[in-house]
């Protein structure tokens, strides 16, 4: 009996490579929500512009045996200097998406932040992925 063929994995080499894949897979409203910025998208444009100032510089023919991406943040050691940012309504993109994201972040040893607009209760996420941060929206000062 022949083994079932696995679906082909698209080649993703950079973050921008995810965009056309997401556009094909997600319903238009969900893609628009996650792809676009708020209001006139000035913050989105500013963030992209700021990251354009950075690049990775390969260093050829150097020793790599002692390298580590590990960092310490707030007394906790993480495997890499990046993590999973809060994704509003994460469960709309994948079944129990918030649990998937936070669980994978925990397995990879990187921080994850649960959105304040998560559809999964934070207690459920905290039990499944201890150490997950929470994006809290505090009420403003009425004075």
Positions of predicted regions on the chain:
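Conserved, mostly hydrophobic/aromatic
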Residues: 27, 84, 105
């Amino acid at each position: 009996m022949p083994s079932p063929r696995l679906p082909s994995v698209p080649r993703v080499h950079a973050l921008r490579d995810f965009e056309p894949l997401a556009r094909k897979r997600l319903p238009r409203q969900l893609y628009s929500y996650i792809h676009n910025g708020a209001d006139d998208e000035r913050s989105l444009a500013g963030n992209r512009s700021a990251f354009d100032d950075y690049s990775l510089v390969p260093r050829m023919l150097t020793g790599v045996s002692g390298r580590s991406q590990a960092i310490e943040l707030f007394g906790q050691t993480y495997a890499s200097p990046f993590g999973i940012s809060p994704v509003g309504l994460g469960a709309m993109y994948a079944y129990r998406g918030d649990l998937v994201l936070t669980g994978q972040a925990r397995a990879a040893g990187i921080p994850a932040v649960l959105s304040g607009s998560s559809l999964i209760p934070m207690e459920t996420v905290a039990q499944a992925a201890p150490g997950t941060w929470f994006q809290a929206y505090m009420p403003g000062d009425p004075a």
